[in-house]
């Protein structure tokens, strides 16, 4: 059984998590932990959060029975949790709204964020515009090339987008730069981390804000079928959309849970982002978790067709869930994700994000091994508008 009280008071999920940061950040993290502990059960805070999720984000979003996709596959019934229908087009806004309300109560005037696919950057710039914060978003220069439309959206919303040209010029490097900024501007700045990684209390806090996904999906599936689903599937980069779906089901032992990492060009090629499958425990971005590193402990460059999964670490709770065996982690490669992207688009008229397409691809494989009476909930974590240029380029089309 999974203990619901994790993390412990030090932010540990078993041997993972914690607060591995420079002394200059410890006070800021303790201040944040104190504020979150104070407000997480505060009725005024929760009431305001609920109102914003309902009226601004558009929750609850539907649990959609993908009848045509299910029929074409010929196995289990596939249900899509439609996070792509949220305002800004992905699950990220669930968390940025929560952290923005916390920043407001803490008296901060400036918010910063890191972003890979650009969705978290857009969600942060969106809440900054709504609540009147100054906003700076750090983004790898490689990702800026891949996600030009999201970069423009952030700028339109009033954010300053800072290109990061160090390292692999992707998400891990953007996170490093954001942490450096926070060290220098701790007094007036709130760092809105977009995933369940980072130092305590971020993995817990982001999980709690994203758990609305699983809470809704659980109730919706019960309402539609009168029972719990047989399986859950979600993609895992840092892991926030996945833990958001998984967390409310962890104690339901009848429900199989699968996290899907980016297999890139194949695990055997070394060009992938599958930290849990091919990595080993180490410390990255303030927490102990599984990460992709060489024999000297240096973080490796990663690859995925989807910018949002292109990260060499993973949230510490996922590391714990892997070790305990409660969640099974799989890898889907670029070509399999692209096939699923096209199949869902053609059968259901829903264009998924490339990140979400990894989950859809594994759900298709899994469904074929199950009966028509069984069901799978897939977290459709975002929409594919941002990926049009990437997919078109792969197809040899210029848009």
UniProtKB/Swiss-Prot annotation:
One of its GO terms (cellular component) is cytoplasm. It catalyses: (1S,2R)-1-C-(indol-3-yl)glycerol 3-phosphate + L-serine = D-glyceraldehyde 3-phosphate + L-tryptophan + H2O. Its cofactor is pyridoxal 5'-phosphate. Pfam families: PALP. GO terms for molecular function: tryptophan synthase activity. Its EC number is 4.2.1.20. Pathway: Amino-acid biosynthesis; L-tryptophan biosynthesis; L-tryptophan from chorismate: step 5/5. The modification N6-(pyridoxal phosphate)lysine is found at residue 92. Keywords: Amino-acid biosynthesis, Aromatic amino acid biosynthesis, Lyase, Pyridoxal phosphate, Tryptophan biosynthesis. InterPro entries: Trp_synth_b_CS (IPR006653), Trp_synth_beta (IPR006654), Trp_synth_beta/beta-like (IPR023026), TrpB-like_PALP (IPR001926), TrpB-like_PALP_sf (IPR036052). The beta subunit is responsible for the synthesis of L-tryptophan from indole and L-serine. NCBIfam families: trpB (TIGR00263). Tetramer of two alpha and two beta chains. HAMAP family: Trp_synth_beta. PANTHER family: TRYPTOPHAN SYNTHASE, TRYPTOPHAN SYNTHASE-RELATED. Belongs to the TrpB family. This is Tryptophan synthase beta chain. The lineage of its organism: Bacteria, Pseudomonadati, Pseudomonadota, Gammaproteobacteria, Legionellales.
């Amino acid at each position: 059984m999974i203990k619901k009280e994790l993390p412990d008071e030090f932010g540990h999920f078993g041997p993972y998590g914690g607060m591995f940061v420079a002394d200059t950040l410890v006070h800021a993290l303790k201040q944040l932990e104190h504020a979150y502990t104070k407000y997480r059960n505060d009725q005024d805070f929760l009431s305001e959060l609920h109102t914003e999720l309902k009226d601004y984000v558009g929750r609850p979003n539907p649990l959609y029975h993908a009848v045509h996709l299910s029929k074409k596959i010929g196995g289990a019934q596939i249900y899509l949790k439609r996070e792509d229908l949220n305002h800004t087009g992905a699950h990220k806004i669930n968390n940025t709204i929560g952290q923005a309300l916390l920043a407001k109560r803490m008296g901060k005037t400036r918010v910063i964020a890191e972003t890979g696919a650009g969705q978290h950057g857009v969600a942060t710039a969106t809440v900054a515009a709504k609540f009147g914060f100054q906003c700076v978003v750090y983004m790898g220069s490689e990702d800026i090339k891949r996600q030009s439309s999201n970069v423009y959206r952030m700028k339109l919303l009033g954010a300053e987008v800072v290109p990061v040209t160090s390292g692999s010029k992707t998400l891990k490097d953007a996170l490093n730069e954001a942490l450096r900024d926070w060290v220098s501007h701790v007094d007036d700045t709130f760092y809105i981390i977009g995933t369940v990684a980072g130092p305590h209390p971020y993995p817990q806090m982001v999980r709690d804000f994203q758990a609305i996904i699983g809470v809704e999906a659980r109730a919706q599936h019960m309402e539609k079928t009168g029972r719990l689903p047989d399986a859950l599937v979600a993609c895992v980069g840092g892991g926030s959309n996945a833990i958001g779906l998984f967390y409310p089901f962890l104690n339901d032992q009848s429900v199989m849970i699968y996290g899907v990492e980016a297999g890139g060009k194949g695990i055997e090629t070394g060009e992938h982002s599958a930290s849990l499958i091919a990595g080993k425990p180490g410390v990255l971005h303030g927490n102990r978790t599984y990460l992709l590193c060489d024999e000297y402990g240096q973080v490796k460059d990663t690859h995925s067709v989807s910018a949002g999964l292109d990260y060499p670490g993973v949230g510490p709770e996922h590391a714990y869930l892997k070790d305990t065996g409660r969640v099974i982690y799989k890898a889907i490669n670029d070509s399999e994700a692209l096939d699923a992207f096209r199949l869902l688009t053609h059968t259901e008229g829903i264009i998924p994000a490339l990140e979400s397409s990894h989950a859809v691809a594994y759900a298709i494989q899994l469904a074929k091994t199950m009966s028509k009476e069984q069901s799978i909930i897939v977290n459709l974590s975002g929409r594919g508008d941002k990926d049009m240029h990437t997919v078109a380029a792969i197809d040899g089309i210029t848009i």
